[in-house]
């Protein structure tokens, strides 16, 4: 029986990538800086002390981080009791966004530029907004700028409730984000609007990676908070991903947990399981691992690391999340059988100590555990697509166009 359990720790970078200078991210190090702050006692909100992640250490995260940066994370040394193969990978896609990272992991790097809305104010063209307004029968939009999602609902949420005008905003990523109140605007209305925006962007050749529904609740700016009902309406993959190949060539199953299905536009997904919150995502993953059949990929994205702690520059929260995940990792490891593969990786960085609120261009860990495979140093992988190619070889699928088998 062959099964792959692929877990993406969203934004868990382990040191700036070789091309980080193109993104002004030289020196960024999501994992290393979290470890440093914990060691120095500067990440003690809701937790305390040095970062405690024994299971990640056992899978090789410390050694992988050292190979990526040339030095061990502060307070750690070489770990000799590693049970997994470990290495690190750099991205060849043009962007440092979720879609690019995940597609490249699945064997389809995004080599051309996305459409970005670069103006800090009046970010979306009026001609585009007018098309959306006409088709959606809205009275207008508010926002239309670069913004942090939590900041903009605090600033414009009350006006949105009064006017019923959706809040639209973007970032340095290729995204069109729409924030609306779940009760006063309606969750179904928000999803419908996002589908309309996705249709118009595609029709008029705006190569925007994601339209993101950002629902929130609360009665005033002191109470507004985003809910777990976020949805991503992604552009469809340009080529066949390894998850689609598994379904097409082996009639296999791909179980998508969290926002994975949205990232691939539902393409190459057999079953989509909605799950929110780090603990619940881990529980759902464990549940699906226990019942996974032959030729199955259980594919989980742990979004909280990125959305709750990375973008919000919350070092303590990120550290606490890593410790929570590590506490669930022992059970995950115990469920991996002789012919299974457990793969832990990330899609980009989001250093909570870095300037601004955006992603960081970083190398990502590649940790592969299987009781039936001899542990090995995987080296510096020149593309995330090596993961997709490895999965393709493992399931005896036709070759992917990018990447090399690591095993």
Swiss-Prot record:
EC number: 5.4.2.7
Cofactor(s) of this protein: Mn(2+)
SUPFAM superfamilies the record matches: Alkaline phosphatase-like, DeoB insert domain-like
Annotated positions binding Mn(2+) 1: 10, 347-348
Binding site for Mn(2+) 2: 306, 311, 359
InterPro entries: Alkaline_phosphatase_core_sf (IPR017850), DeoB (IPR010045), Metalloenzyme (IPR006124), Phosphopentomutase_DeoB_cap_sf (IPR024052)
Entry's cofactor comment: Binds 2 manganese ions.
GO BP term, pick one: nucleotide metabolic process
Reaction equation(s) it catalyzes: 2-deoxy-alpha-D-ribose 1-phosphate = 2-deoxy-D-ribose 5-phosphate; alpha-D-ribose 1-phosphate = D-ribose 5-phosphate
Pathway, per record: Carbohydrate degradation; 2-deoxy-D-ribose 1-phosphate degradation; D-glyceraldehyde 3-phosphate and acetaldehyde from 2-deoxy-alpha-D-ribose 1-phosphate: step 1/2
Name under which the protein is recorded: Phosphopentomutase
Gene, per the UniProt record: deoB
């Amino acid at each position: 029986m062959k099964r792959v359990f692929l877990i993406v720790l969203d934004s868990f970078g382990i040191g700036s990538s070789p091309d980080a200078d193109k993104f002004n991210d030289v020196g960024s190090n999501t994992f290393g800086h979290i470890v440093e702050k914990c060691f120095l006692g500067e990440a003690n909100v809701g937790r305390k002390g040095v970062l405690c992640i024994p299971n990640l250490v056992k899978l090789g995260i410390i050694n992988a981080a050292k190979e990526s940066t040339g030095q061990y994370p502060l307070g750690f040394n070489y770990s000799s009791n590693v049970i997994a193969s470990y290495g690190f990978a750099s991205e060849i896609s043009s962007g440092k966004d979720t879609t690019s990272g995940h597609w490249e992991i699945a064997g389809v790097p995004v080599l051309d530029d996305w459409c970005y809305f670069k103006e800090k104010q009046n970010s979306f063209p009026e001609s585009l907004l007018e098309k959306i307004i006409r088709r959606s029968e809205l009275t207008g939009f508010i926002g239309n700028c670069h913004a942090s999602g939590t900041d903009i609902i605090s600033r414009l949420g009350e006006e949105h409730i009064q006017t019923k005008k959706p809040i639209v905003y973007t970032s340095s990523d290729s995204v069109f984000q729409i924030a609306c109140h779940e009760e006063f605007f309606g969750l179904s209305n928000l999803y419908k609007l996002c589908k309309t925006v996705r249709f118009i962007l595609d029709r008029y050749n705006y190569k925007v990676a994601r339209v993101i529904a950002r629902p929130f609740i609360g009665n005033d700016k002191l109470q507004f908070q985003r809910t777990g009902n976020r949805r991503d309406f992604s552009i469809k993959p340009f080529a066949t991903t390894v998850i689609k190949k598994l379904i097409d060539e082996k009639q296999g199953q791909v179980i998508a947990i969290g926002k994975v299905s949205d990232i691939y536009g539902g393409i190459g997904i057999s079953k989509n399981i909605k799950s929110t919150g780090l603990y619940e995502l881990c529980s759902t993953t464990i549940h699906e691992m226990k019942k996974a059949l032959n030729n199955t990929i259980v594919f989980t994205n742990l979004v909280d690391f990125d959305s709750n702690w990375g973008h919000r520059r919350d070092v303590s929260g990120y550290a606490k999340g890593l410790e929570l995940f590590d506490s669930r990792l022992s059970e995950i490891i115990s469920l991996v059988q002789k012919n299974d593969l457990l793969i832990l990786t990330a899609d980009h960085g989001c250093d909570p100590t870095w300037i601004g609120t955006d992603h960081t261009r970083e190398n990502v860990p590649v940790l592969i555990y299987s009781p039936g495979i001899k542990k090995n140093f995987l080296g510096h992988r020149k593309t995330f697509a090596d993961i997709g190619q490895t999965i393709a070889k493992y399931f005896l699928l036709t070759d992917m166009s990018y990447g090399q088998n690591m095993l």
